[in-house]
């Protein structure tokens, strides 16, 4: 999953590619859920559909942001691609739409996550990528 952010060239001087969060932000993440072997009670593993990164509830996860400038023939805008970091959605509706159209997989579930205050983020109209995230709970 990659986030693409387009910046108009005439706005480049007053635009930052990244921002620092001033307060915690609730986001929605799509994860795969699979049951673990347990004799006494049901346990699950949660992991990223794209990178197989394992998430543990209430644990702070950190990652660098991989930010790349894409070449373009346009003289009006610049496309920035972020392919490293924790990719999430800004709303549950956007995540549900993405899940139903592109991830038609019974293992895929929506999860509530928090990007903590002080995290570095990049966002567009629907997605957000951060260098830190905490998996809170599975959404029903």
At which residue positions do the language-model features occur?
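Conserved NAD+-utilizing ADP-ribose enzyme module
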Residues: 1-86, 92-140
